[in-house]
Amino acid sequence: MIKKELGIIGIGKIGSALLRRFINSNTINHDNIIIYDINYDRLKAISNEFDVSIAKNIAELVKISNYILIAVLPQVINTVLEEVKEVLSEQQVLISIAAGITINHIKTFIPKSVGIIRIMTNSPALIGEAATAIAINKDVNEKDLSFAKNLFRSVGIVVELDEIHLDAVTGLSGSGPAYIFIIIEALADGGVKMGLSREISIKLAAQTVLGSAKLLLETKKHPGELKDMVATPAGTTITAIHELESAKLRATLIRAVEAATLKSRSLNSSSFK
């Protein structure tokens, strides 16, 4: 087969969402991509939708891809790496989005001087609004790093960090959308309790979160400053904030990020080796 720029192993929800954004943003041409998934029906459907090549197996994909994006669950990445290592060359680059799987863990399967890029993104990649963090090993050059950054800029913002921080990124922005959905749902429940319809309550709550986030990013003001702009003396907002503080909302969110971070670290434990 003709050499491909990008091979994607795993075309589940995130893998297919990334593929969609890569192509629709014109970051990479469809005929420069090859994909593989253990679910052949899904693989065929995605191939037909985006007009991309499919591989018969992992080995075939690796042999003809310059960059290999591994988009599988951490629980099965060892099995994938066992197959990848048999045909991987030192000129290729591995890109992994498996949560909690460190570069050193991958290196135990890939002893060669292969460039490894670890990615932590999140579910808003589905609509091109992801928050993505990238970490690399010493074998990744500027060209390879630029390729990965350009890919993931097509799904949102990208930051480069030392790998030691990626588990915290997992706890904050990786799991963060779920926290925000709970907050939106709870705000909507409050609206319903006070007499608004469910539909209107969800719409208002979601737009409030979206608008507040945009205001923060565009003004670059500290969130506390923006909060104080809304909380006027003896007003409704400061009264509500008092309730949130009494219920220890801040501490609960901090503990949630901490718990998810520790769980991410544990995913690379001996149970996966």
Q: What are these regions, as identified by a protein language model?
A:
Residues 1-49, 53-56, 60, 129-130, ...:
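NAD(P)+-binding Rossmann beta1-loop-alpha1 motif at the extreme N-terminus of oxidoreductases
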Residues 18, 40, 50, 58-134, ...:
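Rossmann-like NAD(P)(H) cofactor-binding subdomain of soluble oxidoreductases
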Residues 33, 43, 61, 77, ...:
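Small-residue helix-packing motif on alpha-helices
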Residues 105, 109-115, 131-168, 181-218:
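Internal alpha-helical scaffold of NAD(P)-dependent oxidoreductase catalytic cores
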Residues 117, 166-171, 223-228:
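Short pre-catalytic strand/loop immediately N-terminal to key active-site residues, enriched for Gly-Thr
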